[in-house]
Amino acid sequence: MKKEELKKKLSPLAYRVTQENGTEARFTNEFDDFFEKGLYVDIVSGEPLFTSLDKYQSGCGWPAFTQPIDKKVVKEKRDKSLFMERTEVRSSNADSHLGHVFTDGPLDKGGLRYCINSAALRFIPFDQLESEGYGDYIKYFS
């Protein structure tokens, strides 16, 4: 999708986050304190990224997940911006900036914390997976 089409499709915040590597404000975003059962997809492409089963309250101010739905749906890049070194997380299909992954997550779940911007995500409630075209993902919740 071309930049001009994306500017029309996305909110200004979602565009800034996904296309310009922005970061939304902590503790004031849509999914930080949201724990309904369902699927989180890339707001740009609709690619499934995370499930609510892997979401947890990390206290960081952004949605946190222990793992993506499949390692292939995200790619990681070294990020040396803001005078620090981090690992950026991007969606594989649309190359959307999602957030960062850190090694301070729950040890019993692998030790990773995927710290993701709400503005990069669209939530599909479990009871709407079939009607929204994500019926194949119901199996993840059984």
From Swiss-Prot:
The active site is at 115 (nucleophile). Residues 3-126 form the MsrB domain. It comes from Lactococcus lactis subsp. cremoris (strain MG1363). One of its GO terms (cellular component) is cytoplasm. GO terms for molecular function: peptide-methionine (R)-S-oxide reductase activity. The lineage of its organism: Bacteria, Bacillati, Bacillota, Bacilli, Lactobacillales. It catalyses: L-methionyl-[protein] + [thioredoxin]-disulfide + H2O = L-methionyl-(R)-S-oxide-[protein] + [thioredoxin]-dithiol. This is Peptide methionine sulfoxide reductase MsrB. Belongs to the MsrB Met sulfoxide reductase family. Its EC number is 1.8.4.12. Pfam families: SelR. InterPro entries: Met_Sox_Rdtase_MsrB, Met_Sox_Rdtase_MsrB_dom, Mss4-like_sf. Keywords: Oxidoreductase. It comes from the Bacteria. The gene is msrB. One of its GO terms (biological process) is response to oxidative stress. The keyword Oxidoreductase applies.
